[in-house]
UniProtKB/Swiss-Prot annotation:
Location in the cell: Membrane
Single annotated GO MF: frizzled binding
Biological process per Gene Ontology, one example term: negative regulation of osteoblast differentiation
Membrane association type: Single-pass type I membrane protein
Transmembrane annotation, as ranges: 153-173
Extracellular side: 27-152
Glycosylation sites (chain numbering): 87
Entry keywords, A to Z: Glycoprotein, Membrane, Signal, Transmembrane, Transmembrane helix
Entry protein name: BMP and activin membrane-bound inhibitor homolog
UniProt gene name: Bambi
GO CC terms: cytoplasm; membrane; plasma membrane
UniProt source species: Mus musculus (Mouse)
Length: 260
């Protein structure tokens, strides 16, 4: 008992450690347009809590953008630090930018990095930021609803499968019981027929044996054939088409029957 309790406490401590690691290890969701993110709704989770947006062609400022989690890059977050230092030191257009909020890289790279040059541009950026936030919120709600339906399906499908399996087992048991009952009825009928035929055959056989015994015993020393017995035997066995082939011979004084 003590051994099992010690195992239980060790397992509980391991579970608590794993939960603590998961809680301390932050993850954020990022917009991802890579091929491997299509199945996950164009989203990925970053264990480094960093998303990126960059130009596919650094030499062309109008180049299309690519987005994703920083974990998918070859290096770590040092790329973001180096690029940030380069961005602050020179006026050149940056080719990569990192952010650390959920779906923060959904906006374009130019919208994220371009500073507001005037009050009008600041208001436009603020309006675009609000609209992008609303879009991000809608995407998160859609993803949450998809996850909810997926969890419901994961729970409902095994339950439905179990119910179908139980119904199939009950149907199979019912079929087996009906088949067993039918076989028992057929067996009972067969046994009844055999019983009746066996007893009827023995009763007829007993009557024939009794008639043979009466015919074998000589009556008052007569030496002629037992014609009366033969007639009685023929009358009894007329239904079965059996004829008596036994003819009694002369009865000698030594008590022996001789057949002719």
């Amino acid at each position: 008992m003590d051994r099992h309790s010690s195992y239980f406490f060790i397992w509980l401590q391991l579970e608590l450690c794993a939960m603590a690691v998961l809680l301390t290890k932050g993850e954020i969701r990022c917009y991802c347009d890579a091929a491997h993110c299509v199945a996950t709704g164009y989203m990925c989770k970053s264990e480094l809590s960093a998303c990126f947006s960059r130009l596919l062609d650094p030499q062309n400022t109008n180049s299309p953008l690519t987005h994703g989690c920083l974990d998918s890059l070859a290096s770590t977050a040092d790329i973001c630090r180096a690029k940030q230092a380069q961005n602050h030191s020179g006026p050149a257009m940056p080719t990569l930018e990192c952010c650390h909020e959920d779906m923060c890289n959904y906006r374009g790279l130019h919208d994220v990095l371009s500073p507001s040059k005037s009050e009008a541009s600041g208001q436009g950026n603020r309006y675009q930021h609000d609209s992008s936030r609303n879009l991000i919120t809608k995407m998160q709600e859609l993803t949450s609803s998809k996850e909810l339906w997926f969890r419901a399906a994961v729970i409902a499908v095994p339950i439905a499968g179990g119910l179908i399996l139980v119904l199939l087992i009950m149907l199979a048991l019912r079929m087996l019981r009906s088949e067993n009952k039918r076989l028992q009825d057929e067996r009972q009928q067969m046994l009844s027929r055999l019983h009746y035929s066996f007893h009827g055959h023995h009763s007829k056989k007993g009557q024939v044996a009794k008639l043979d015994l009466e015919c074998m015993v000589p009556v008052s020393g007569q030496e002629n054939c037992c014609l009366t017995c033969d007639k009685m035997r023929q009358a009894e066995l007329s239904n079965e088409k059996i004829l008596s082939l036994v003819h009694w011979g002369m009865y000698s004084g030594h008590g022996k029957l001789e057949f002719i």
